[in-house]
Curated annotation (Swiss-Prot):
Disruption phenotype: Decreases the growth rate of the virus to 2-4% of the parental virus in swine macrophages. GO terms for cellular component: host cell cytoplasm; host cell nucleus; virion component. It comes from African swine fever virus (strain Badajoz 1971 Vero-adapted). This is Probable AP endonuclease. One of its GO terms (molecular function) is DNA-(apurinic or apyrimidinic site) endonuclease activity. It is found in: Host nucleus; Host cytoplasm; Virion. Zn(2+) 1 binds at H78, E271. Its cofactor is Zn(2+). Its EC number is 3.1.21.-. Zn(2+) 2 binds at H115, E142, H218.
Length: 296
């Protein structure tokens, strides 16, 4: 279930004006076939990302659904950076998130990723209660990156506390998006196979609270030190999490994450947004070649 973030800025043909998301996905699928790694998943923006504006056009909706069905792709949308239903602007935000969820349903997108805030679990649950569930579309709460806040949602205790509240409130269609760069930035050491294994075993111990069917991953290395609180992604084995394991990859924490992802069939997205299409494809070719070797 491995794939990547598909930015239409970097993936669509020049001059594309109406079906740019579909065009981007078509080019992305062709690229996966070219490098010998057929993609099973993808992540897109259908709105924003920095403004509350829907940016998928009607023609694009029709063609995107056809593309997703044709290639049997699991696609998730990332919410805008304003999608914070536990904020002071919650009424407007909730309405906008509802629009995004309905569009996801319409075009065959399976989920919407929202950034978790560094706030108490009860505030998050109250915000989620304002959103009407849309059948077949999961809201994935993404682990945040922070250094000083009490609630980082990078430890299993805090993740369990949050999802117990979600379950006890009978909220439906809520999942977890684990960003490896974010939990590292928040102080969780996942560099070695043993370190990552300890964290992932703790995750497996709470599958009764948050099942793997509702877990996805953002599989990123990080350009900053553990506990920095800074969100800066790097290519796999090029950042500070796993670079020291580039010549012993099966002893790395990344290999442990790959094992968990394949064992439980979780979607995993590489989030890269480099300066040019050529830079991006060069980086992804190296990363997916490495992943292919880990999947043997």
């Amino acid at each position: 279930m491995f794939g990547a973030f598909v930015s239409h800025r970097l993936w669509s043909d020049s001059g594309c004006t109406t079906t740019c998301i579909t065009n981007s996905i078509a080019n992305y699928v062709a690229f996966g076939e070219q490098i010998g790694f057929p993609f099973k998943s993808a992540q897109v923006f259908i709105a924003g990302p920095r403004k509350a504006v829907i940016n998928i056009q009607e023609d694009d909706k029709v063609e995107l659904l056809k593309m997703i069905v044709k290639h049997n792709l699991w696609v998730v949308a990332h919410g805008t950076y304003l999608d914070v239903p536990w904020s002071r602007r919650s009424a407007f935000v909730t309405h906008f998130i509802q629009q995004e969820l309905l569009i996801c349903k319409e075009v065959g997108i399976k989920g919407l990723v929202l950034h978790l805030g560094a706030v108490e679990p009860e505030l998050i649950v109250e915000g989620l209660k304002k959103i009407k569930p849309v059948e077949g579309v999961v809201i994935y709460l993404e682990t945040p990156h922070n250094k000083h806040h009490t609630y980082k949602y990078s430890t299993m205790e805090q993740i369990k506390e949050l999802f117990l509240r979600i379950r006890n409130t009978r909220l439906k269609q809520i999942g977890l998006c684990i960003d490896t760069a974010h939990i590292w930035s928040s102080g969780v050491n996942i560099s070695s196979y043993n370190d990552a294994g300890q964290w992932l075993r703790s995750l497996e111990n709470i599958h009764s609270v948050i099942p793997p069917s509702h877990i996805m991953f953002h599989l990123n290395d990080a350009a900053t030190e553990c506990g920095s609180g800074i969100d800066r992604h790097a290519s796999l084995f090029e950042g500070m999490i796993w670079k020291s394991y580039s010549h012993k990859i099966k002893k790395s924490g990344l290999y442990c994450f790959v094992e968990y992802i394949t064992r439980h069939q979780c979607p995993a997205i590489l989030e890269r947004n480099l300066g040019s299409s050529m830079q991006l494809q060069t980086a992804l070719t190296a990363e997916f070649t490495t992943l292919k070797s880990l999947l043997k």
